[in-house]
Curated annotation (Swiss-Prot):
Top EC group: transferase
Gene Ontology biological-process annotations: 'de novo' CTP biosynthetic process; UDP biosynthetic process
Cellular component GO terms held in the UniProt record: cytosol
Coiled coil: none
Family under the similarity heading: Belongs to the UMP kinase family.
Alphabetically ordered keywords of this record: ATP-binding, Cytoplasm, Kinase, Nucleotide-binding, Pyrimidine biosynthesis, Transferase
Task of the protein: Catalyzes the reversible phosphorylation of UMP to UDP.
Keyword ATP-binding: yes
Pathway membership: Pyrimidine metabolism; CTP biosynthesis via de novo pathway; UDP from UMP (UMPK route): step 1/1
Pfam families, per database record: AA_kinase
Binding site for ATP: 13-16, 56, 60, 163-164, 169, 172
Protein name listed in UniProt: Uridylate kinase
Length: 240
């Protein structure tokens, strides 16, 4: 591994909205291609990278349920949306020469591999990027929880959550001008202050398994590689 990389293996969590760019729905090809280049830059450091992507740019299960749809059915639709996003990012990565595998928690053998932990680890060891799709494969669980679960299963050194801002704030900095930005927090502080980082199930999984969460700005060029190297602006959440 390159000497300036702080982690050996990381999981990158991207929201579905992060793939929209300036659009109001769906995928923005330029944004997807830029994210692929960011992932490649980290892979080129010698870091093993796996990815979980949300589906909110296409369909969000919670929103479907609030409109009267059965929650389990809505969540299944949301999980399928993440497969579309995963295939899009896989295509973008392979265009820049990064060998990539998509593994889905919902089996669809003509589209991608089924999630098999040992196979996923072997892909990472061979230098491939692995994108985990379809969440946990079960309704009522968010893709944040899926990201935490896969990070633990893969033995990742950190879960890197790419967001719209450069870390964790006391309130939404786009709405509250005097929101306080944190450089470092404990898991217990995040839960006690009810900070909007990830859902409580994801936080609990990472806390119990000692996987730090690092929050950084998805939209700043080079931020992923800088964060993996311990530079730039980010918030790290870890045990005491």
């Amino acid at each position: 591994m390159a000497s300036d990389a702080k982690f050996r293996r990381v999981l990158l969590k991207i929201s579905g909205e992060g793939l929209m760019g300036t659009r109001e729905y769906g995928l923005d090809p330029e944004t997807v291609d830029r994210i692929a280049r960011e992932v490649k830059s980290v892979r080129d450091l010698g870091v093993e990278v796996c990815v979980v992507i949300g589906g909110g740019n296409i369909f969000r299960g919670v929103s479907g349920a609030s409109s009267g749809m059965e929650r389990a059915a809505a969540d299944n639709m949301g999980m399928l949306a993440t497969v579309i996003n995963a295939l899009s990012v896989q295509n973008a990565l392979e265009k820049v020469g990064v060998e990539t595998r998509v593994q889905s928690a919902i089996v669809m053998p003509t589209v991608c591999e089924a999630f098999i932990r040992r196979r996923a680890i072997r892909h990472l060891e061979k230098g491939r990027v692995v994108i985990f799709a379809a969440g946990t494969g079960n309704p009522f669980f968010t893709t944040d929880t899926a990201a935490a679960l896969r990070a633990v299963e893969m033995g990742c050194d950190a879960l890197l959550k790419a967001t719209q801002v450069d870390g964790v704030y006391s309130a939404d900095p786009k709405k509250v001008k005097d929101a306080v930005r944190y450089d470092r927090l404990t898991f217990n502080e995040v839960l006690a202050r009810d900070l909007a980082v990830m859902d409580t199930s994801a936080i609990a999984l990472c806390r119990e398994n000692k996987v730090p969460i690092v929050v950084f700005d998805l939209h700043r060029p080079g931020a992923f590689a800088e964060t993996v190297s311990g530079r730039g602006l980010f918030t790290i959440i870890a045990n005491d």
